[in-house]
Amino acid sequence: MDINEWEGWYVEILEDFGFSREGDEKTADLLDKILEEKGCLTIGDLYNEVVYTKKKDTDKFIIFGAGPSLKKHIEIIKNYNLDNYVLIAADGATTALLEEDIIPDIIATDVDGKISDLLTANANGAYFVIHGHGNNEENIEMWTDSFNKVLGTTQSIPVGNLYNFGGFTDGDRAMYLAIELGANEMVLAGMDFGTIVTKYSRPDIEGETGPADEIKTKKLIYAERLLNWILENTDVNVINLIDS
């Protein structure tokens, strides 16, 4: 999705959630400054190092969300030849993958997941796409320097080293990242778009699952709409395991 197309979505999201464009831009500037000082990846670097070199120029991707179906879908995916797929995890899904001894190739995160697991995945080779927005300035400042192999994104107009490929939540941003990296086939695991959340997306809940709050429910509605945009406007073959 190009930035002009995204702008319409972005304005709607700002109005619907009461978010601040200025807050997003402030955090984007902070993330860009940190990455400028520490060094960061370009989208070309990410493609060359992960898609082209590590995964032999595959055009197949698996996107892992943190929905209730995630563990069931991981069991299905264990039967795939994962050498043929780029694995992109949305933030909290990383924990579930580590529990099954799977290291994602790329993690899309706004750094609000289980930090110890994110650091473990990074130390074991996972690349990071770190997203700055108005509500995570503190996490960006605290944790960005702790990660290696980082590409930065924003949901506002890109500045400096940052990109905006489209997408709002970690899961749908992972989908749009896959498209930017050349996806022709995209398997979705743990992408439920429902009203139930898991401990992987909300570590503070009691038990394995719980009801999504109003904000989370609205975010998941946008995530599903953004998936539908992909289905309607691209030629990517999307296989959602929730339908299997």
Language-model segments: what does each one mean?
Residues 63-68, 170, 185-199:
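Glycine-rich anion-binding loop/nest that anchors nucleotide
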Residues 2-6, 10, 40-124:
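Metabolite-binding pocket within alpha/beta catalytic cores that recognizes anionic/polar moieties
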Residues 152, 186-190, 238-242:
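A structural signal for short, well-ordered beta-strand segments and their strand-loop junctions
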Residues 85-86, 94-184:
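Acidic/Gly/His-enriched mid-domain segments of enzyme catalytic cores or analogous surface patches
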Residues 1-61, 71-76, 205-210, 216-244:
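N-terminal donor/sugar-recognition subdomains of glycan-related enzymes
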Residues 58-65, 78, 156-163, 208-209:
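Short, basic, glycine/proline-bearing loop/turn elements
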Residues 178, 190-193, 227-234:
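Short leucine-rich amphipathic alpha-helical surface patches
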Residues 193-212:
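Phosphate/ribose-phosphate-bearing ligand recognition and processing surfaces
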